[in-house]
């Protein structure tokens, strides 16, 4: 149903079928459900052009400075400088393209991009060009974001950067994963599923909370199981808090793989592990680092190294300078004495 102050209608040869309809000024277009499961859609634009196919069915339409509203719970609202819509032989919407300054709102979810394409059959909304989406759990920026409007899952590609609010439902808080700090991350690609409970980063993935960080080829964070997994060129760095005795001490670990459980606060590194702390270097096949609560001054409680362990310890003795001790073993343990 089209409404406007002035509407022009052109008929096909013979005068029995509509060829096209257009408005000379602002108008509204209502799409009413004609089958079970469909929802009502409304469009408002500064001008509207409609092209018809055979049988007086809508083939496509175009509008400028358009706002759309889809009646669902909550309502879905979009706006853009231009909108193009395509329909099937039954006048059912199949594809919607919105160009230039696209904006999207559905409940507490927001999105924007230079261009958006909605495929009705798959319910996928693709945002292209300076794409961004946000909800109360955080925000995602990327060159391209593809959103499943039915499940809420999405994929972000190209120059991905994310900001996630602290999770109060996670496991124990530590330097590796804090329940009190915002987590930021970058990668070439990211996917989010299960209502943002499962996050996957790949391609030069980096995540950090304050000064504490982890980087790897790929990174997975599962809020439902309280697990974080990193694979390929893994490097973690976390800091003890500043104390009256001196500046913060950092612990850096490199490995091929990492699995961390916030329930146990155990970080399990495997594959050519290399640990560095001031005055201590440990190389091993695998290492289990037991982290303290994030409120503790020291981040590392203890660490167990296994397999071809090589240890270098440096101490400074008054009047004698530095003293270096080295050792090898199949097993070694580090215990924090604080």
Where does each model-flagged region fall?
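Mature-chain termini and adjacent capping regions
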Residues: 1-338
């Amino acid at each position: 149903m089209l409404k406007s102050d002035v509407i022009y209608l052109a008929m096909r040869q013979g005068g029995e079928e509509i060829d096209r309809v257009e408005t000379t000024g602002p108008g509204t277009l209502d799409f009413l459900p004609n089958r079970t499961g469909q929802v009502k859609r409304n469009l408002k634009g500064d001008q509207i052009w409609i092209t018809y196919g055979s049988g007086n069915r809508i083939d496509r339409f175009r509008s400028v400075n358009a706002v759309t509203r889809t009646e669902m719970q909550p309502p879905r609202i979009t706006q853009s400088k231009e909108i193009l819509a395509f329909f099937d032989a039954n006048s059912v919407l199949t594809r919607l393209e919105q160009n230039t300054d696209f904006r999207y709102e559905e409940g507490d979810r927001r999105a924007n991009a230079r261009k958006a394409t909605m495929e009705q059959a798959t319910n996928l909304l693709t945002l292209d060009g300076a794409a961004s989406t946000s909800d109360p759990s955080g925000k995602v920026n990327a060159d391209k974001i593809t959103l499943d409007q039915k499940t809420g899952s999405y994929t972000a590609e190209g120059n991905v950067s994310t900001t996630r609010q602290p999770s109060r439902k996670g496991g124990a808080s530590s330097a590796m994963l804090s329940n009190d700090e915002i987590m930021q991350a970058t990668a070439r690609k990211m996917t989010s599923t299960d209502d943002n409970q499962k996050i996957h980063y790949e391609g030069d993935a980096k995540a950090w909370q304050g000064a504490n960080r982890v980087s790897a080829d790929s990174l997975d964070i599962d809020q439902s199981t309280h697990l974080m997994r990193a694979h390929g060129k893994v490097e973690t760095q976390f800091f003890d808090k500043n104390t009256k005795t001196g500046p913060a001490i950092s612990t850096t670990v490199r490995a091929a793989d990492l699995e961390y459980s916030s329930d146990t606060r155990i970080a399990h590194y495997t594959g050519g592990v290399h640990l560095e702390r001031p005055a201590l270097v440990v190389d091993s096949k695998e290492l289990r680092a037991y982290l303290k609560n994030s409120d503790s001054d020291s981040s590392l409680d203890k660490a167990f190294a296994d397999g071809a362990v090589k240890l270098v310890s440096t101490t400074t003795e008054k009047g004698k300078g530095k003293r270096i001790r080295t050792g090898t073993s199949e097993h070694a343990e580090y215990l924090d004495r604080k």
